[in-house]
Amino acid sequence: MENSEKTEVVLLACGSFNPITNMHLRLFELAKDYMNGTGRYTVVKGIISPVGDAYKKKGLIPAYHRVIMAELATKNSKWVEVDTWESLQKEWKETLKVLRHHQEKLEASDCDHQQNSPTLERPGRKRKWTETQDSSQKKSLEPKTKAVPKVKLLCGADLLESFAVPNLWKSEDITQIVANYGLICVTRAGNDAQKFIYESDVLWKHRSNIHVVNEWIANDISSTKIRRALRRGQSIRYLVPDLVQEYIEKHNLYSSESEDRNAGVILAPLQRNTAEAKT
């Protein structure tokens, strides 16, 4: 299959990135290799979208620091970048809205590009054309329009399984995410994503739009474990990018005090969805 026939894909990873780890970066590489390897897709970009402070997750440090760490982690990447839109929102934004924002942004950019494209004219002397000839000639001179890349949600199996947590997700949001965008789920050791998809009617219905990527090289790094090591004064070298480690140490970001941030506060999606369910 030629590149022109492949669907271009943008991988979007939403999350706390508290802090970003080497595992987060590996998710992008694993997903890119898998999608390109199908012969049906070409991954053209990866986007890291840190959640805003309004998410109210326990131990979540300010978005300002999390964004900077993500930018430091992707400093040398040629295709993965950090987007701040979600992190700058005053209210927590559902993942569906973040996906929609980035898809609309791509479509708007493509529209602007087409409008600004120069009009091609037939060189040489003007002559009279029949309507059929004129239409055919114009068609051959017009540049081929390129399809807008499709945004797909990149995640780990833990996010996939969180769909089953009561009031954490709206059922209609889950349906739209898997039906209109799609998931690329990288599985960790001990997760059975395929079984979870089988046990969910919604996920099973749209299983063709859910790509499960097996991580054959075991990597159990997590932000939670990184924060725990930091609280205990243990080394995190080789678990996060060097620049991220330096930034954490310079600003003394993670401690017992920071882990108590938002303690006792209900997570934003649980608070909102529970309230809406009662109305």
Swiss-Prot record:
Q: Where does NAD(+) bind?
A: 15-17, 23, 57, 92, 95, 156, 158, 168-169, 215, 219
Record pathway: Cofactor biosynthesis; NAD(+) biosynthesis; NAD(+) from nicotinamide D-ribonucleotide: step 1/1; Cofactor biosynthesis; NAD(+) biosynthesis; deamido-NAD(+) from nicotinate D-ribonucleotide: step 1/1
Q: How is the cofactor bound?
A: Divalent metal cations. Zn(2+) confers higher activity as compared to Mg(2+).
Q: What is its EC number?
A: 2.7.7.1, 2.7.7.18
Where would you find the membrane-spanning parts of this chain? none
Q: Which residues bind beta-nicotinamide D-ribonucleotide?
A: 15-16, 55, 57, 92, 95, 168-169
Which SUPFAM superfamilies does the record associate with it?
Nucleotidylyl transferase
Q: Which CDD domains match?
A: NMNAT_Eukarya
Q: One of this protein's GO BP terms? A: negative regulation of neuron apoptotic process
Q: Name one GO molecular function term.
A: ATP binding
Q: Keyword Nucleus, does the record have it?
A: yes
Q: Does the keyword Zinc apply?
A: yes
Q: Which InterPro entries match?
A: Cyt_trans-like, Euk_NMN_adenylyltrnsfrase, NadD/NMNAT, NMNAT_euk, Rossmann-like_a/b/a_fold
Quote the subunit structure annotation.
Answer: Homohexamer. Interacts with ADPRT/PARP1.
**Protein name per its UniProtKB record:** Nicotinamide/nicotinic acid mononucleotide adenylyltransferase 1
The protein's organism comes out as Homo sapiens (Human)
